[in-house]
A protein has these predicted regions:
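Loop-helix junctions at membrane interfaces
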Residues: 1-201
Length: 201
């Protein structure tokens, strides 16, 4: 019972951190023109590793819902891909917007947790294995977010996303790849570093 209460308390703290990061300007979301860079996946990853995959999925859900709410309340030019309630320049969100905003974020903690556990099992007893496991889990969680979100945008909103961001439709996947390489990989590396540094403390 004590562990359950502790886990619920920690989940509450992580929830508060995620909400605060989503609300405070430049803390969780960094505006980059037609996209936002984010580090909100970091508390989702850390929470999943500490509390397990169910709590990881819950924290990812919180992240996803805050993403949808932010896209609705303070929309940017491509916010329709994250909110079914937004219309920007004739381009509207739909149910797939909610899927893109929420499902990848739910997957972040689940993937990070199982990657961490797998590495710890395979590298059991090897010096430094926990550091490696935390770092790789952080990267895996970050890349899960980026790959699922950006490919979801391409599949469900390719044409309207291209038009809203002033890109040619035939080159839109090049733009998606550019975002994955230019923002997704650095975000994932930062997630790996922060996950390792914070969780080991």
């Amino acid at each position: 019972i004590e562990k359950k209460v502790l886990d619920m308390s920690l989940a509450g703290i992580f929830t508060a951190i995620i909400i605060a990061m989503s609300v405070v300007p430049f803390l969780g979301y960094i505006p980059l023109g037609f996209m936002n860079a984010t580090i909100i996946h970091v508390p989702v990853i850390i929470g999943a590793i500490i509390l397990g995959p169910k709590y990881g999925a819950y924290l990812g859900l919180v992240f996803g819902v805050t993403s949808l709410v932010k896209a609705t309340i303070t929309p940017g030019v491509t916010s329709f891909v994250f909110s079914p309630f937004v219309t920007i320049g004739g381009y509207s969100g739909n149910m797939w917007s909610a899927v893109i905003a929420i499902v990848p974020r739910v997957c972040i903690g689940i993937v990070a947790y199982y990657v961490y556990k797998l590495i710890m099992k395979v590298a059991h007893g090897i010096k430094g294995s926990q550091t490696v496991a935390l770092w790789v889990a952080g990267i895996a969680g970050g890349m899960t977010n980026t790959l699922l979100v950006m490919n979801g945008i391409y599949i469900f909103f390719g044409q309207s996303y291209a038009a809203a961001s002033n890109k040619a439709v035939e080159h839109i996947y090049d733009v998606i790849l550019g975002i994955i390489l230019g923002f997704g990989i650095p975000e994932a590396i930062v997630a790996g570093i922060l996950t390792t540094a914070i969780t080991k403390v």
